[in-house]
Amino acid sequence: MRYAKRPVVTALASVLLAAGLAHAKVSEEEAATLGTERHPFGAEKGANADGSIPEWTPKWLGLPPGLDYAGPGETRPNPYADEKPILVITAQNYKEHAENLSEGQQALFERYPEYRILVYPTRRDFDVNERIKERVKWNAVHTEVSNGVETLKNYNGGMAFPIPTGVPELMWNMRTANCYESYHVAYDGYGVFANGERAHDAVDFWQSNPFNNPANPVGTTEAVVGDYIVWTFSERLAPQSTKGQMTVVQDPMDFKNHKRNAWTYDPGTRRVRKAPAIGYD
């Protein structure tokens, strides 16, 4: 019986893909709802039925008043530092909330009686700068998918499809959700095993999206910016066995006519090599 489901799933996926290709762009009138009836990225502005997701109230843009942030390397301030949790889930009451907990979270309560989850109110208080709003609104009426799901066309930065109509748009939204021009972060963490052993992993990570360059006027597309939507550089800082390894990746916006470019540097051999095995996971 399980094999009989495959044609149905395949047929449904085909219909969804076809629907997405047929309705990639929206009207000027519908795009005008972005920032008014909708969040600038397309989400509903109002609260959901039970109030667990509140209304979007764009009262802040950037650093909220009264808070200090010295910049990269410093801890970001918490605008809700005085807020108290509305619920504390413990090993004693977690089964009452099982429908909202993953299997892993439930297992933690079983194994570690002192484990707790503090639940705070959801907030939607931050706004989006006007340049990004205009880019996303422009995309809504101009950007489209072609060549199945492989090619993004007439894109000018920001989220590609704020009002998606099918699966291809949702896929491209995952690739264009970050609206920064450049991004730099150092990931540093430990994986802790059940026996208490720890695995240290640290990466210095840079990413650039040339389409989000503020110097590009709204409506500047791949015809000017070029065929690559994201550039990524990473360097391994830990563990010691991989320290110094570097990776550079270029992601195209047209996967039909351009491949992902990737190179790695191995400090052991002091060689740079193409890395076709770096895939899309």
Place the predicted regions along the sequence by residue:
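Solvent-exposed N-terminal domain segments of exported/luminal and surface proteins
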Residues: 28, 33-259
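Gram-negative bacterial Sec-dependent N-terminal signal peptides
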Residues: 2-23
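Short, His- and charge-rich active-site/binding loops that engage polyanionic ligands
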Residues: 267-268, 273-281
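N-terminal charge/polar-biased segments
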Residues: 24-25, 270
